[in-house]
């Protein structure tokens, strides 16, 4: 274990905490972001893009509790396993809260249009296998709440703003913003 910054804490085999006031507790955890704590196994939250668990990730003032999570951004929290919070081309990734397993919140992976990216913020998910991916369409993706499983915020239509969307249910493919999807399999008509 390596604690290499002021007030850093590292406990566990190959645990590393190099961000000020950060901590890595468990096996193979990596934390470089200031004020960020990771508890579990094989989680990563460095401040500079480095290859770790196959991902380039950053995190500041954030926290992870679980296993095999990746975390970017600022003021984000993850509880569970195999969750991904990844900035990609988004101009900001803040205030994301995930509770569950196999959830993804990210910007667009298309770097050819990254100058058109917006901010992703205010996303709250409780459940598993939910996906929120922003498209590079100059629109921010904000204030999305999901309670359920297997839901998708579908931003494939770049003309639509999917902000202010609430889903309470499972197996929903949300295609209209400023909307509430209530019940499993519900849709905008």
Q: What function would you assign to each model-found segment?
A:
Residues 1-189:
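Glycine- and small/polar-enriched repetitive beta-structure motifs of secreted/surface proteins
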């Amino acid at each position: 274990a390596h604690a290499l910054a002021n007030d850093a804490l590292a406990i566990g085999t190959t645990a590393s905490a190099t961000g000020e006031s950060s901590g890595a507790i468990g096996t193979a955890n990596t934390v470089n972001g200031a004020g960020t704590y990771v508890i579990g196994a094989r989680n990563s939250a460095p401040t500079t893009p480095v290859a770790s668990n196959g991902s380039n990730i950053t995190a500041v003032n954030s926290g992870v509790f679980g296993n095999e999570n990746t975390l970017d951004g600022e003021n984000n929290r993850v509880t569970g396993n195999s969750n991904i919070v990844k900035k990609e081309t988004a101009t900001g990734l803040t205030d994301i809260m995930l509770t569950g397993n196999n959830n993804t919140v990210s910007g667009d992976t298309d770097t050819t249009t990254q100058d058109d990216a917006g901010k992703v913020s205010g996303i709250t998910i409780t459940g598993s296998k939910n996906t929120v991916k922003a498209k590079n369409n100059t629109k921010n993706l904000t204030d999305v709440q999901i309670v359920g499983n297997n839901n998708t915020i579908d931003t494939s239509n770049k003309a639509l703003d999917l902000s202010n969307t609430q889903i309470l249910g499972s197996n929903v493919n949300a295609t209209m913003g400023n909307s509430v999807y209530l019940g499993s399999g519900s849709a905008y008509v």
